């Protein structure tokens, strides 16, 4: 199977303006993500850039970036435009949507995403970490994946921001990286927004409500996710060069 990692990136962030260009120990955050993906050596890597400034910083480190429309509603829409511009002969089988705000993403996480697509009966793959505290379950800023029986079936039954504590043993802290079989991405983009997607503000519910199968792979450690200035300061402390 031929795999392509696409990192969607745009400057317009309500909580942290110009987030992709934020400096982490001498390099823009988007460069850290790009380098981690490239060093994993499991797929070709490009950036779907919503702004020329992002395209330029990636090209300055020898990478490839596709300039997309700036006003896409989601990262999935952005990577789909980039895919069609970059791969006009449809040579790639799988597409990995890697968020541009995960500056210390590990190779094993990306490897897991790809291997799930190849080994499971799923349309989409994603990642999670076992939830260890009630506080995580009750925190609406943490998206949870619910699987009734992971030992028999790693297909996600539901995603939500809050669940009853009685479901603790079946909940996983969701990490927003997605692998798509190419035809699944094409199908997903063609679907209308679903009710749960709108109500919960979770794009992946569009797939669930249209009977697309999302496989969850477990990893041991959450990557840093940078959404606020506090997250950025934490990343700078952790990622000391």
Q: PLM features: residue spans?
A:
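Short phosphate-binding loop-to-helix
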Residues: 46, 52-98, 102-112
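A conserved hydrophobic position in a structured secondary element of the catalytic/binding core
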Residues: 49-50, 105, 180, 227
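Conserved alpha/beta core of the MobA/IspD/sugar-nucleotide pyrophosphorylase nucleotidyltransferase superfamily
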Residues: 169-241
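Conserved core of the sugar-phosphate nucleotidyltransferase
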Residues: 105-194
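Short, high-confidence coil segments that cap the C-terminus of an alpha-helix
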Residues: 42, 90-92, 120-123, 212
């Amino acid at each position: 199977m031929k795999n392509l990692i696409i990192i969607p990136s745009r400057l317009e962030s309500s909580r942290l303006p110009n987030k992709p260009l934020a400096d982490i120990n001498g390099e823009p955050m988007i460069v850290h993500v790009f380098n981690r993906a490239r060093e994993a050596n499991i797929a070709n890597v490009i950036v779907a850039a919503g702004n020329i400034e992002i395209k330029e910083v990636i090209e300055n480190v020898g990478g490839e970036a596709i300039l997309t429309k700036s006003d896409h509603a989601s990262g999935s829409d952005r990577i789909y435009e980039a895919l069609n511009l970059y791969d006009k002969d449809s040579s790639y089988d799988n597409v990995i949507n890697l968020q541009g705000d995960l500056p210390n993403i590990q190779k094993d996480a990306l490897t897991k995403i790809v291997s799930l697509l190849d080994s499971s009966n799923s349309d989409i793959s994603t990642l999670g970490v076992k939830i260890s505290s009630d506080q995580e379950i009750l925190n609406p800023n943490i998206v949870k994946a619910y699987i009734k029986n992971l030992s028999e079936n790693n297909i996600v039954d539901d995603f939500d921001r809050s669940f009853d504590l009685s479901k603790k043993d079946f909940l996983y802290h969701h990490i927003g990286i997605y692998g798509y079989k190419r035809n699944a991405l094409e199908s997903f983009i063609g679907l209308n927004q679903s009710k749960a997607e709108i109500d919960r503000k979770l794009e992946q519910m569009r797939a669930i409500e249209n009977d697309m199968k999302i496989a969850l792979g477990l990893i041991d450690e959450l990557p840093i996710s940078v959404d606020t200035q506090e997250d950025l300061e934490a990343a700078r402390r952790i990622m000391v060069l």
